[in-house]
Amino acid sequence: MASEEASLRALESLMTEFFHDCTTNERKREIEELLNNFAQQVGAWRFCLYFLSSTRNDYVMMYSLTVFENLINKMWLGVPSQDKMEIRSCLPKLLLAHHKTLPYFIRNKLCKVIVDIGRQDWPMFYHDFFTNILQLIQSPVTTPLGLIMLKTTSEELACPREDLSVARKEELRKLLLDQVQTVLGLLTGILETVWDKHSVTAATPPPSPTSGESGDLLSNLLQSPSSAKLLHQPIPILDVESEYVCSLALECLAHLFSWIPLSASITPSLLTTIFHFARFGCDTRARKMASVNGSSQNCVLGQERGRLGVLAMSCINELMSKNCVPMEFEEYLLRMFQQTFYLLQKITKDNNAHTVKSRLEELDESYIEKFTDFLRLFVSVHLRRIESYSQFPVVEFLTLLFKYTFHQPTHEGYFSCLDIWTLFLDYLTSKIKSRLGDKEAVLNRYEDALVLLLTEVLNRIQFRYNQAQLEELDDETLDDDQQTEWQRYLRQSLEVVAKVMELLPTHAFSTLFPVLQDNLEVYLGLQQFVVTSGSGHRLNITAENDCRRLHCSLRDLSSLLQAVGRLAEYFIGDVFAARFNDALTVVERLVKVTLYGSQIKLYNIETAVPSVLKPDLIDVHAQSLAALQAYSHWLAQYCGEAHRQNTQQFVTLISTTMDAITPLISTKVQDKLLLSACHLLVSLATTVRPVFLISIPAVQKVFNSIIDASAQRLTDKAQVLVCRALSNTLLLPWPNLPESEQQWPLRSINHASLISALSRDYHSLKPSATAPQRKVPLGDTKVIIHQTLSVLEDIVENISGESTKSRQICYQSLQESVQVSLALFPAFIHQSDVTDEMLSFFLTLFRGLRVQMGVPFTEQIIQTFLNMFTREQLAESILHEGSTGCRVVEKFLKILQVVVQEPGQVFKPFLPSIIALCMEQVYPIIAERPSPDVKAELFELLFRTLHHNWRYFFKSTVLASVQRGIAEEQMENEPQFSAIMQAFGQSFLQPDIHLFKQNLFYLETLNTKQKLYHKKIFRTTMLFQFVNVLLQVLVHKSHDLLQEEIGIAIYNMASVDFDGFFAAFLPEFLTSCDGVDANQKNVLGRNFKMDRDLPSFTQNVHRLVNDLRYYRLCNDSLPPGTVKL
């Protein structure tokens, strides 16, 4: 014993040293090694058993339990049966003896270790494992311990990790399912007993039927008077011990509900009991009493009571989240909803002492979250099922949800509730779309609720009604979606407004427009307060209160303009004529507002509070332009109608809009406003396309300022947008006009002069015989290249999907710039930032204008690139120039992707050199690099080469297929095909999961479209190599997220030759597996059934993989020299 005693003292001092602040990392590593070596010794567990019973040192106990855990989970197979019996007997005794005094985390760990033994040995060698747990639960002294054991068993045995064979996993699940009814009965009994015991002693008399608690909805919601009566019982006050037992029982239930199927085992009495406990969460009295009585003990009690409510709601939500509900369980669900809505009514009850919001503020935040989760699950999963029950009052439910939503104490809570309304509105919309006949009935039923929702959501986004809350929202920090908290708040609110508009267009419009009108009056009335001062114009509103009111009104106007813009889509298409007048009213107001803002130059005005009011004025102006832009599709439809009726009204709208835009296209205007004006101009030119646009003086003014060499250039983004608008005005066909009236010759001349002016400086960079290259500093040259190519690339990109005529004119204007680019390219091959921009430009040209460029010139470009990208140049770009260099190579490969996809024979002569470039120059550089750069693009190019040029490799003739019945194609260029396949195979051995997924998809696509796996060369030389690699990937768990895709791919490959797979490949694969013995290999082979359907086959694959890993784990854990029988 002395040695055990000495070891314990040594271990305690080592542990104390290890966790001491002054211990160096070096020394910690030494101690760690020492402890690991100790744990590996045969029989180390005996020392640990002594340590556990003899020490009070937490670190030592934790270490000892870790040794046991390792022994049971990794080495159990090799432990002599006598030792196992001793461990199975000693650890539970230790737990029983010390569970009251052990720290909770040690006790829980010891429970887990005992459950781990059960996972391995129950019921065969540890037959009383589960009965022991049931006995612990039934004995009042050990109930908490039994519940902890039960929860741990549910966690570890119902969904065990992969260190068990599939057969054992299935056996454990079945064993547990057999116990479910007993366990649920026990848990129900515990909860009911505690409740009943404390209900009897509750001091508060039950409320009379007429008192405030009996809500007016109860008669509807609760059909059975007995459950109503039960729910009216006062909530008992529990002692600490009972509180603890109930929380453990509810935790057990929540975990059990996560995996057991919905069935009759879940009895009505269990559900009612859970709801009793859910009431603890909405009991504000307990909190009040705790705070009145003041003692910390009482405060803890208040929190614990709240926690019981949270746990009970977790149980309810576990049941709610199950989409598949057996018929016999539907009635239970209905009862659950009724009981939950009783709770919802209770927490949204408004009486003198409490406003709803203050009541919600008093509740535990987690309880509110759980309750909101319940409501979300109810609407998203069960509403369609429940709505048809006549006894379920959906409209009353919406009334409660409305109160609950608009009294949420936090912004996050409000967002979550808006999500629920969005789900409800989506449900209504899809219901109406699927059953058009019921539209009126559905809308009549919900109309009042929707109008109320719309009004309240609109009030919530206005500072006029909600300033205190809105001021709290952050409008500076961007989240992951690149929006601020305020923008997110506004966007989510406007989505709800838009969904109501879709269902009730007239109501929505008549609710929103007057509110917009009120705020517009304030804005349009500002003109009377503008006075001229020495330095310009000033807004003569200075009183602090007036400034604050103006600030609120401007913020609201900005939000309402966004709302009006969001609704634009509900005025077009089939309803254009019916809602024409409403839309015209909106558009006329918007045009008036934008013109007003531009004329009195509110964006440049001096104000009393410049840091607040100036951004407000700029924002309103920008939002009015953006809202008008949202109506561009409506204007386009109006343009079509106006063309037939030749209406002056439409011409005036467009001309006035241009008068509003033109003053803003200037370097003196703030970026936000400038870009809004540019975007509106682009929409007019691209979407509306009025014939007279180019002849409007305001547009000609913009055109002249852009081609004027002396004019100051706009910022990059604005310049690109304005040039796009002008180019589209000249290039896009006018709607509703025949080809003969399109005025192409005149438009072509104008377009050429526009492009010529834009690329003037760029052309001057090209060296010629008469004028050798001007010495422009490199920095300036780069600026010229960037400015010109960004504009030209954008112009091409925007024309690429248009008519042939538009593309022809575009290419005629650009021809010289393209030739200049090709001439300059070699000079900048070592400047990766310039090459990157040039290749972007060429890529856009190839995608949009390759037909117009013509074959000879396209060939010249491709040849130039192939000559420039030598192996040395590629290596320099990829290896030494970082991300820009890689981007250059990726763009070059993208250009080649466009080339290999071109139908017809034109570019076929390039295939050999493109494949050679890929396989001999790019692939060797990137194959072994861990970085994913360039790989995705290279493999996409290889895939497109195969997919679009299949006959380059497989020559199939009609005659051959007629003669043989099945064409066994002639194979050509076999070495190249094999090299490409080899590269795909290699890519599956690399860690990058995105590349793996992409390449697996490419192979599967080639099989679907071209029968790749059936081709003789693939079938005979590659098929089972690929299957082998994919199986190994599954075994190594390196790409676990793709398990399903890999399983399907293995099936598709194996199905080409099932006989070969079962008879030759599988035995061979098992023979080559290391870490398993012959007997285990036989079992693995026998368990792989010869099923040939996809679900069974993939199930067999995953079973094989799981069991192979399990056997290896077992064998690794056996002590050396173990004899296996």
Swiss-Prot record:
Q: Where in the cell is it found?
A: Nucleus; Cytoplasm
What Pfam families would the database entry show?
Answer: IBN_N, Xpo1
The alphabetical list of record keywords is:
Acetylation, Cytoplasm, Nucleus, Phosphoprotein, Protein transport, Transport
Carrying Phosphothreonine, the residues are 201, 204
- Residues bearing PTM N-acetylalanine: 2
- Domain of life (superkingdom): Eukaryota
Q: Name one GO molecular function term.
A: small GTPase binding
Entry's Gene Ontology BP terms: protein export from nucleus
GO CC terms of this entry:
cytosol; nucleolus; nucleoplasm; plasma membrane; protein-containing complex
Q: Is Phosphoprotein included in the keywords of this UniProt record?
A: yes
Q: What does this protein do?
A: Mediates the nuclear export of actin and profilin-actin complexes in somatic cells.
Task: Report the protein name in the record.
Answer: Exportin-6
